[in-house]
């Protein structure tokens, strides 16, 4: 377990580009992702909403965000790109429990299952609604299919 933590500490030095941003405030640095705002030293566990397609198909992305007490880089860890990849999903759930945001420099975004439609349908590579592979859909489209919208977030 210590080797895993050491690897993640080294990885944490790499800043990953996301649609999340740090909001500068006079008293502290807030972290915003989707419609969620997190204060320094806090953890958010919940879902990011994926906008509906044609008022019918909707989804969400379960995440954990540890926003460190001190400024630093942002690291995104993403599991569940394909609907049948269970090991990374379990690994992210366990890893999320190990982080103490009060001791953290920067922010860790953990996406537990990126592709809920494929996970729910147990499809290997493609989403059941639009037959697109999330891994091939990045950077995504704000007004695209459900898979493209997930990739955009």
Tell where the protein language model's regions lie, with residue ranges:
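Sec-dependent N-terminal signal peptides
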Residues: 4-13
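N-terminal signal peptide c-region/cleavage motif recognized by signal peptidases
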Residues: 15-17
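Structured catalytic-domain cores with a bias toward divalent-metal coordination
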Residues: 20-153
């Amino acid at each position: 377990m210590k080797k895993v933590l050491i690897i993640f500490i080294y990885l944490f030095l790499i800043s990953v580009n996301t649609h999340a941003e740090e909001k500068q405030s006079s008293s502290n640095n807030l972290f915003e992702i989707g419609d969620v705002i997190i204060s320094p030293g806090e953890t958010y566990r919940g879902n990011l909403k994926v906008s509906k397609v044609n008022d019918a198909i909707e989804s969400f992305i379960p995440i954990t965000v540890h926003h460190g007490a001190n400024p630093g880089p942002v690291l995104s860890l993403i599991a569940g790109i394909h609907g049948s990849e269970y090991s990374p999903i379990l690994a992210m759930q366990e890893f999320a429990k190990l982080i103490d945001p009060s001791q953290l420099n920067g922010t860790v975004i953990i996406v537990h299952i990126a592709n809920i439609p494929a996970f729910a349908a147990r499809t290997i590579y493609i989403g059941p609604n639009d037959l697109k592979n999330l891994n091939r859909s990045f950077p995504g489209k704000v007004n695209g299919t459900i898979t493209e919208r997930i990739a955009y977030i």
